[in-house]
Amino acid sequence: KYQNSPESDIYHKSNVLYYASKLGIFWTGLVHDLTKFTPTEFNRSVKYFHGKKSPTIVERASHDNFSYICVAHTGRNKHHWQYWVDYTRWEIVVNKIPYRHALEYVADVLSASKVYNPKDFNFMVAHDYFKEHSKTYLMHPATKEFILWCIKEAHDNGFKAVKKKISKAKYIEISNKYTPTIIVPITNIGMENFEIK
């Protein structure tokens, strides 16, 4: 009913706010994704609005798989893993998403799952979807583990099991198992390796 429509953004945002408040980050939920209303994101989203597909997918189809909407959005919103990925000439540097933004990601995943799969929605559907799709993300393993833990705990024991004091301690415990950044070497660097036609 709501998928990929203006109503879906409102429905998604209201669900993010609900889950964020349950996670103890009400203000973060309230200001979630406000950049969607900036000219860069909003105007292009209107231009590439389809009704059955995300505007980013439609824009990519028109621009050789590049989306200005996506680049602008993920570069301004700290709950997106792309925000925490940096590049040097020879390596990709993947940082952990800080605690508050990782919780916002949890709220975002739960809400998106509810919007896009309303008939079958439950927390484990969201958990499994994230687990499968995050395999292709350049996401720090500590962040991934924390997000999966939060969703499973909320599913098994309710939001009381992931209240701030508990989830913050778990975030620190998981984070301490990993280095702050993961370095991914880049091979075949340089445009000389590509044929430009």
Task: Put a short name on every predicted segment.
Residues 1-196:
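Metal-dependent phosphohydrolase cores
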